[in-house]
Design a protein with these regions (language model features):
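Structural signature of nuclease core domains in nucleic-acid processing machines
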Residues: 1-212
């Protein structure tokens, strides 16, 4: 996908395709091409639909990692995924001023520091969250949004676990140079997550899923 155009419109098109295409289709490229065609009028980009569809096939065949060992997006069908989970949840009492003590992002940072092991990629994010730019911010009112997908996968204990998915099309590395695999190495991904505060997004989405 490195040769495809970037930007918000491209990201919205990819999100729409991943939201509506059936990953278990016998001909996945044809399924993805049809989905691109359906959404192209809303999110036009300078890329042929079949080229974008071909780029999205490997996305579906890439292992999901240790939280879903042996699985890819192609393996998880419509019955095991909830797409676009809309939510609205109260934060520390919602809009009832005085009904709950003030809770700030700095308090959330303290939780991260106390609960996450030192080797966890999100552990170091606590310092950024505790800083003057974010730390004093109060959690008050309501949080609304939409989670791109929730996946149900087998749990090693014999049950199921549920994974939060938020699709990203960010281009990492030097935008003036061709992309290389190292631009998306684990350390680079972790740095991008911290820089864009995606760690906080993931944490909030996990709370939403827990309440759901």
């Amino acid at each position: 996908m490195a040769d495809l155009p970037g930007g918000a419109t491209f990201g919205s098109l990819v999100h729409a395709v991943l939201e509506t295409a059936d990953p278990r289709a016998d001909d996945l490229k044809a399924e993805l091409t049809a989905a691109v065609d359906r959404h192209f009028g809303w999110w036009p980009v300078e890329a042929p639909p079949d080229v974008l569809a071909a780029a999205l096939v490997p996305v579906h065949d890439t292992p999901l990692g240790p939280l879903a060992p042996g699985l890819t997006l192609r393996d998880i069908g419509p019955h095991d995924r909830l797409r676009e989970l809309d939510f609205e949840i109260p934060l520390a009492g919602g809009d009832l001023v005085g009904s709950a003590p003030d809770v700030t992002l700095g308090h959330v940072a303290d939780l991260l520091s106390g609960l996450l092991p030192a080797g966890d990629p999100a552990h170091g994010y606590a310092e950024r969250l505790r800083g003057p730019g974010l730390g004093p911010a109060k959690l008050r009112g309501y949080l609304s949004g939409s989670i791109d997908a929730v996946l149900r996968v087998p749990d090693p204990a014999g049950g199921h676990r549920y994974l939060v998915v938020d699709y990203k099309t960010n281009r990492l590395g030097d935008v003036q140079q061709p992309s290389v695999a190292g631009d998306y190495a684990p350390a680079a991904l972790a740095a991008a997550m911290v820089h864009s505060d995606y760690v906080l997004q993931a944490l909030l989405y996990s709370v939403v899923l827990h309440r759901f």
